[in-house]
């Protein structure tokens, strides 16, 4: 059977989703989880784009040992140099070069002739091969390119040393039949193409990213580029979990193998969703909350008698736990650590100790601590204090049917400094956010506000996700608490801390650029 390699671009293309801004710690955690999932290649970022991206790619390359780490690069020497400096410490450094090949891109964006584009691509591949043992070359907007020109430039970059040829559907335009025909055309019209790997990269603008990727595999592709949960700019990218499970369940049809550890899929999906703030729809294939739910009486009866009547994917295949341990106030540190590890999370002794304190605080208020509660606590403890410019000290919100909602907030910042503000609003959350805006003394546009319960019951934790815009920065935040208003405040403060972190990084980049 052919082996299909999975090239994960969650940390590069996926992070281009509107409002998604991952910090270094979060990127490293996702990279470690992708390694546990056993993807073949992790595209960690675009090293030349910023100092922050460079550092993230460098640290991921030095951390990940069992899969290849790559970075994106334009066809210019300065980008290639930056990528090598970031990636040279990796276990298997490789470069992902690209240049546009469609008439619309060459004329309006690059302002280059086809001959100039070929020359730039060939020169970039030759230069990159001085450093990188593996060079992947991508024809941006390949699916709107003229096929004879596409074949010509692919032949030239193969001669120059490219070992992987990627054919991206950059704008999600192509149909499955047409996409497969492009791969066949190249195999029939490009000399020595049998000596390289063909790769697919599909966007979901017309809802066909996954089926296009599968069509490419049917027609000769041996690598597929995708993201966890299908996140990405505009309508997103092909969803890794859907392609992977389709290839597994229908191995009889596709006749291919992968090295993926499918039992890590659900955990990876949860991690990416929590850290990016991009919620997985309940009806999402493979990883949605309802993916294994049966409401129809006929379906329920069938599944109880024989699971395969209506269930083609077992929850256990993708890592949905079949058992749920309930912890309580009498549970000790050992039981907590055991369940954390059972759920697939790795925490240091210090992190376990901090988590145990939060666990005990919650157990005093809530009789049973479920897996969902525990995961929420892990995320809050491990990721939500990455760079706390401001911390919530206290909130007080007054609300009554015939009263104007009023909020009082105290924030801590720096070394022992405090801010206290009060404001009103037409509702409790409105009053709370007006007060926080006063604390930060800047105009904040709230783009999205979502709340969901963690588990069920009256004492369930509340989890709030917000998306904000401050000046030209758009980012998200999250907060968890038993009280809805406290969770709302934490989410807003978390988002603002991200804003200040991004602005500080930009200022540092500008300082480096002018020095």
Swiss-Prot record:
Pfam families: HCS_D2, HMGL-like, LeuA_dimer. InterPro entries: 2-IPM_HCS-like (IPR050073), 2-isopropylmalate_synth_dimer (IPR013709), AIPM/Hcit_synth_CS (IPR002034), Aldolase_TIM (IPR013785), LeuA/HCS_post-cat (IPR054691), LeuA_allosteric_dom_sf (IPR036230), LeuA_bact_synth (IPR005671), PYR_CT (IPR000891). Catalyzes the condensation of the acetyl group of acetyl-CoA with 3-methyl-2-oxobutanoate (2-ketoisovalerate) to form 3-carboxy-3-hydroxy-4-methylpentanoate (2-isopropylmalate). Belongs to the alpha-IPM synthase/homocitrate synthase family. LeuA type 1 subfamily. Pathway: Amino-acid biosynthesis; L-leucine biosynthesis; L-leucine from 3-methyl-2-oxobutanoate: step 1/4. Residues 391-515 are annotated as: Regulatory domain. Its main location: cytoplasm. Residues 4-266 form the Pyruvate carboxyltransferase domain. GO terms for cellular component: cytoplasm. One of its GO terms (biological process) is L-leucine biosynthetic process. Gene3D superfamilies: 1.10.238.260, 3.30.160.270, Aldolase class I. One of its GO terms (molecular function) is 2-isopropylmalate synthase activity. Homodimer. The gene is leuA. Its EC number is 2.3.3.13. Mn(2+) binds at residues 13, 201, 203, 237. Its cofactor is Mn(2+). It comes from the Bacteria. This is 2-isopropylmalate synthase. It is found in: Cytoplasm. It comes from Geobacillus stearothermophilus (Bacillus stearothermophilus). It catalyses: 3-methyl-2-oxobutanoate + acetyl-CoA + H2O = (2S)-2-isopropylmalate + CoA + H(+). Keywords: Amino-acid biosynthesis, Branched-chain amino acid biosynthesis, Cytoplasm, Leucine biosynthesis, Manganese, Metal-binding, Transferase.
């Amino acid at each position: 059977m052919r082996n299909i390699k999975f090239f994960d671009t969650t940390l590069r293309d996926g992070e281009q989703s509107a409002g998604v801004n991952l910090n270094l710690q979060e990127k490293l955690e996702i990279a470690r989880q992708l390694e546990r999932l056993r993807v073949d290649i992790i595209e960690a970022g675009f090293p030349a784009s910023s100092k922050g991206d460079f550092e993230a790619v460098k640290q991921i390359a030095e951390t990940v040992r069992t899969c290849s780490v790559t970075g994106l690069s334009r066809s210019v020497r300065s980008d290639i140099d930056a990528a090598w400096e970031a990636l040279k410490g990796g276990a298997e450094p490789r470069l992902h070069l690209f240049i546009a090949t469609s008439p619309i891109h060459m004329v309006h964006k690059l302002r280059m002739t086809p001959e100039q584009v070929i020359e730039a691509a060939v020169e970039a591949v030759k230069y990159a091969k001085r450093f990188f043992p593996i060079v992947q070359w991508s024809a941006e907007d390949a699916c709107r390119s003229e096929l004879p020109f596409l074949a010509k430039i692919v032949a030239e970059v193969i001669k120059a040393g490219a070992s992987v040829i990627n054919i991206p559907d950059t704008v999600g335009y192509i149909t499955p039949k047409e996409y497969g025909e492009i791969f066949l055309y190249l195999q029939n019209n490009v000399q020595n193409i049998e000596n390289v790997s063909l790769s697919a990269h599909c966007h979901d603008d017309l809802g066909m990213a996954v089926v296009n990727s599968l069509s490419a595999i049917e027609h000769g592709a041996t690598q597929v580029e995708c993201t966890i949960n299908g996140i990405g700019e505009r309508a997103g990218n092909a969803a890794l979990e859907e392609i992977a499970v389709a290839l597994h369940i229908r191995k009889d049809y596709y006749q291919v193998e992968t090295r993926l550890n499918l039992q890590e899929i659900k955990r990876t999906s949860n991690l990416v969703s929590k850290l990016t703030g991009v919620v997985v729809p309940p009806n999402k294939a493979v990883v949605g909350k309802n993916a294994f739910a049966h409401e129809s009486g006929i379906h329920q009866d069938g599944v109880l008698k024989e699971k395969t009547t209506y269930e083609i994917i077992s929850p256990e295949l993708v890592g949905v736990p079949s058992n749920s341990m309930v912890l309580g106030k009498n549970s000790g540190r050992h039981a907590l650590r055991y369940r954390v590890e059972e759920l697939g999370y790795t925490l240091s002794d210090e992190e376990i100790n901090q988590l145990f304190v939060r666990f005990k605080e919650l157990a005093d208020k809530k009789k049973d601590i479920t897996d969902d509660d525990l995961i929420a606590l892990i995320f809050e403890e491990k990721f939500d204090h990455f760079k706390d410019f401001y911390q919530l000290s206290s909130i007080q919100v007054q609300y009554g049917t015939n009263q104007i909602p009023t909020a009082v907030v105290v924030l801590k910042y720096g070394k022992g400094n405090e801010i206290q503000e009060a404001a009103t609003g037409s509702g409790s959350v409105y009053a709370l956010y007006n007060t926080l805006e006063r604390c930060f003394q800047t105009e904040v546009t709230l783009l999205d506000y979502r709340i969901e319960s963690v588990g069920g019951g009256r004492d369930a934790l509340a989890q709030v996700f917000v998306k904000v815009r401050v000046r030209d920065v758009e980012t998200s935040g999250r907060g968890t608490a038993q009280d809805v208003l406290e969770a709302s405040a934490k989410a807003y403060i978390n988002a603002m801390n991200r804003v200040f972190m991004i602005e500080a990084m930009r200022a540092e980049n500008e300082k480096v650029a002018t020095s």
